[in-house]
UniProtKB/Swiss-Prot annotation:
One of its GO terms (biological process) is malate metabolic process. Its EC number is 1.1.1.37. The lineage of its organism: Bacteria, Pseudomonadati, Pseudomonadota, Betaproteobacteria, Burkholderiales. Pfam families: Ldh_1_C, Ldh_1_N. This is Malate dehydrogenase 2. The active site is at H188 (proton acceptor).
Length: 329
């Protein structure tokens, strides 16, 4: 067993996604069965009691890998020397809330957390933004954590990737691990573009096996994009366990590598595929050695261009709102 514990910060620690996430991290699903961990939990002061309840449950599991649990209401304390951070907490959109107001509240949260990460976290920290609007929240975080490496912050789009892979596997009647080279482009929102034009089962292209363009455009894409809404309607609450699972999948591949597989991550654009540089955007990557490399030179047809541009416009509009918010202060 490795003797030095890794420090893992989790914000929104009293929430349902964190509740599904923390126990899996503590039992080794993220870093493996020989890596001790210290959990550094962050939430609002009014959630302190609920977080203590989670702490008691974690203690009662007697996880051998869990060496310490720290609870903080101050981001600087929660992120101190963190090796990995899952930023799950964010301000959810409530009934009647204007988009500008939602972005304003999250801008304040992620400005504070960005500064705290910049000052306190390990210089090799990997930060995954889960709380929505995840792409724009991650962009705000980068803005206020300028001393961290350019590739230190990612936003989660793996949940959409996993949903797409699962739906394709069901359609083709194969195991999910048979599906390779699936891509989800763009924002974690209904404008996302789940793209199976290059996905394979063995050497065969999924699009040739399905051979149904109408299903692709009119059923598959909207079903992936609206899956979260369907879950809320079915269970009366948003995705929690599947979101936590996707967060672990994305971070684990980022840390240990994706074995040559394409996976989808929202990362700062380098200008490829006509996506504005710096925009936090879902793209295909291959992870290796603790880093990710963008998959280049994928063919973009007219339909794909239209779908990608839709997400680009949405994220640029959100960025414009945020820029005006900060200019006003």
């Amino acid at each position: 067993m490795n003797t030095e514990a890794k420090r893992i910060a989790v914000s929104g620690a009293a929430g349902q996604i964190a509740y599904s996430l923390l126990f899996r991290i503590a039992q080794g699903d993220l870093l493996g069965e020989d890596q001790p961990v210290i959990l550094q939990l962050l939430d609002l002061p009014q959630a302190y009691g609920a977080v203590q309840g989670v702490v008691m449950e974690l203690q009662d599991c007697a996880f051998p890998l869990l060496k310490e649990i720290q609870v903080a209401t101050d981001p600087h304390a929660a992120f101190l020397n963190a090796d990995y951070a899952f930023l799950v907490g964010s301000k959810p959109r409530t009934k009647g809330m204007e988009r500008r107001d939602l972005l304003a509240e999250n801008a304040a949260i992620f400005r504070t957390q960005g500064r705290a990460l910049n000052e306190a976290a390990s210089r090799d920290v990997k930060v995954l933004v889960v709380g929505n609007p995840a792409n724009t929240n991650a962009s705000i975080l980068r803005r206020f954590a300028p001393d961290l490496p350019d590739d230190a912050i990612s936003a989660m789009i793996r949940l959409d990737h996993n949903r797409a892979v699962s739906m394709l596997a069901q359609r083709c009647n194969v195991d999910v691990d048979s599906i390779a080279d699936m891509v989800v482009w763009g924002n974690h929102s209904p404008t996302m573009f789940p793209d199976y034009r290059h996905a394979r089962i063995g050497r065969r292209l999924v699009k040739d096996l399905i051979n149904d363009e109408n299903w692709y455009r009119e059923s598959f894409i909207p079903k992936v994009a609206q899956r979260g809404t369907a879950i809320i309607e079915a269970r009366g609450a948003s995705s929690a366990a599947s979101a936590a699972n996707a967060a672990i999948d994305q971070m684990r591949d980022w840390i240990f590598g994706s074995d040559g597989r394409w996976v989808s991550m929202s990362v700062p654009s380098d200008g490829s595929y006509g996506i504005a540089p710096g925009l936090m955007f879902g793209v295909p990557v291959i992870c290796d050695g603790g880093r990710y490399e963008r998959v280049k030179d994928i063919g973009i047809d007219a339909f794909a261009r239209q779908r990608i541009d839709l997400s680009v416009r949405e994220l640029q509009e959100e960025a414009d709102v945020v820029n005006r918010l900060f200019a006003d202060r």
